[in-house]
Each structure stands twice: as C-alpha cells, then as structure tokens.
C-alpha cells in the first residue's frame, strides 16, 4: 500500500511544515503555496490529509483559515496538533532595517520585540514565514529582515540574527488535521472534542443552541464568528466543544438554518 500524502502551507520550514511532520510522520509531504491550495488538494483527493492553522495562543484565531472553511462539508477534522511557535529574525544585519517581512500572524506574535528593536520598519506581509525568510536572504542592502522559524533557517542555511523573539515564550499555534470526505456517522462514539459549523439567520436562534449545550453539559472551548455573506449582519459560527454526543447533533441542527458536523478528535489542550 502506498504511503498517504499530507498537504501543508509551504515552503519547507514553515510552522505548517512542522505540524505536518508531527501529525503524520510517515506520510509523504506536499508543500503548497496557500491555504486555499491546501484545501483544494484535499477536497479533490490529490492528498489524503492536510494541516490548517486555526488559532494562536498569543494572536487568536487565524481568520483566513476559518473563512476558507465556511460552507464546506467535504472535509473532516480528525485531529489537532499544537506546534511551539518560536520566532527568529533572519537577514544580513539589524543595523539599518527598513522592512520586515513575514506572515501577518507572526507580526502580532512578536509585537513587543518589533517595537523595541525595529519600531520604524515597514511591515511587508507575505504568504508564509518561510517565503519571508527566502526573500530576506536575497537582500544585499542589509535593510530587509524576516520573521521566520529556526527550522527554516537551519534547513536553508539562512543567516539567523536573533532567536525567540515571540512575545510569549509559551507561544503555540494550533492546527487542525483534516481529511477528505464529510463526517460519516458510524457506530463509534464521538471523540472528546468536536467541531461544529452553523449558520443562523436571526440572533435569537443562538440562545436556543446554547441552551441545548448547557442542558447537556457540553463545554464550549472555542467560538469563532464570521460574516455569512448571505445577508448583512448574519453570521456563521464555528464552535469547538467538549462532551458533544451524537444524539445532540439533530437537536442542535433543528435551530440552525444550515448545520455541519465537521468532525471529532482527541483534545490536546489542558483547560482546567
């Protein structure tokens, strides 16, 4: 049997690369240029799995990832992976920095170091931290640096100037491990954490949904709200929760205009 394939946001050296290695160490790695390309490869079954960052412990929800998950019922969350997000500065010199390149999430996770050391530098957002490092490594003027991972610097032999510039030394990014195909209701019980996605046309319906959760002691661990783009001021809700049971799926769904059970997986976070 051939090895499974797992897609991640590349190039190699990104935190997504690290997540893929942790999630599926025996799978063949497939580096892709964007989150959209990662999900397209998964839904078209070019790969068997994908990792997608959804939350950082310092900077919160990864909004572009959630927006790509809106309305999808063709993929399933089957795991979560926590990746330590230790950031480094890559470049020629810190003496005359005019531009600092990175993924937008990294800027938010390293704001204290940036303010203290390169407060006047222009932020330039690129698709990944590894792409930022590759671009900065080509600069011959000494005016451009990048925020990236140490793995990226080591793998590509880039010049590493400063290590561990993240605001919080415990900074971590949480990834979902996804596989193709929607949720299949077999006889096995749900795992401890579940991901739900639902659309509500009126805010009063949210109270009804939460009443079901409360009555059955379902604990909400994460709630992300995004514009539905169907009608103004209506929303799609992404809910991660502990204690969801199969008999509650229909009970919650009856209050929702659309409802998708996006999978269940082992919880990797200690909340209590």
UniProtKB/Swiss-Prot annotation:
It comes from the Eukaryota. Keywords: Amino-acid biosynthesis, Aromatic amino acid biosynthesis, Cytoplasm, Lyase, Nucleus, Phenylalanine biosynthesis. It is found in: Cytoplasm; Nucleus. Pathway: Amino-acid biosynthesis; L-phenylalanine biosynthesis; phenylpyruvate from prephenate: step 1/1. GO terms for molecular function: prephenate dehydratase activity. It holds the Pfam family PDT. The keyword Nucleus applies. One of its GO terms (biological process) is L-phenylalanine biosynthetic process. Gene3D superfamilies: 3.30.70.260, Periplasmic binding protein-like II. It is an enzyme of class 4 (lyase). Residues 5-180 form the Prephenate dehydratase domain. GO terms for cellular component: cytoplasm; cytosol; nucleus. The keyword Lyase applies. It catalyses: prephenate + H(+) = 3-phenylpyruvate + CO2 + H2O. Residues 194-272 form the ACT domain. Coiled coil: none annotated. Its EC number is 4.2.1.51. PROSITE patterns: ACT (PS51671), PREPHENATE_DEHYDR_3 (PS51171). PANTHER family: PREPHENATE DEHYDRATASE P PROTEIN, PREPHENATE DEHYDRATASE-RELATED. Belongs to the PHA2 family. Putative prephenate dehydratase required for the synthesis of L-phenylalanine. This is Putative prephenate dehydratase.
């Amino acid at each position: 049997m051939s090895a499974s394939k797992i897609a991640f946001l590349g190039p190699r050296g990104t935190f997504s690369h690290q997540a893929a290695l942790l999630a599926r160490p025996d799978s063949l790695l497939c580096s892709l240029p964007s989150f959209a390309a990662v999900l397209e490869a998964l839904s078209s079954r070019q790969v068997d799995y994908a990792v997608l960052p959804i939350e950082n412990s310092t900077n919160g929800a990864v909004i572009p990832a959630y927006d790509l998950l809106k309305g999808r019922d063709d993929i399933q969350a089957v795991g979560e992976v926590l990746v330590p997000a230790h950031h480094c500065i890559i470049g020629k010199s810190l003496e005359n920095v005019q531009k600092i390149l990175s993924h937008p999430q990294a800027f938010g996770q390293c704001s204290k170091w940036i303010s203290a050391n390169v407060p006047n530098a222009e932020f330039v957002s690129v698709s990944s931290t590894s792409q930022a490092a590759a671009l900065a490594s080509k600069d011959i003027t000494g005016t451009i640096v990048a925020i990236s991972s140490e793995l990226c610097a080591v793998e590509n032999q880039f010049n590493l100037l400063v290590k561990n510039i993240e605001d919080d030394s415990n900074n971590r990014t949480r990834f979902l491990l996804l596989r193709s195909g929607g949720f299949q209701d077999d006889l096995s019980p749900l795992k401890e954490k579940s991901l739900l996605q639902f659309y509500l046309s009126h805010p009063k319906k949210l109270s009804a949904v939460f009443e079901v959760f409360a009555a059955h002691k379902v604990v909400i661990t994460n709630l992300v709200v995004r514009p539905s783009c169907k009608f103004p001021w209506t929303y799609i809700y992404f809910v991660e929760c502990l204690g969801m049971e199969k008999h509650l799926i229909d009970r919650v769904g009856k209050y929702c205009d659309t409802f998708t059970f996006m999978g269940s997986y082992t919880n990797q976070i200690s909340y209590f």
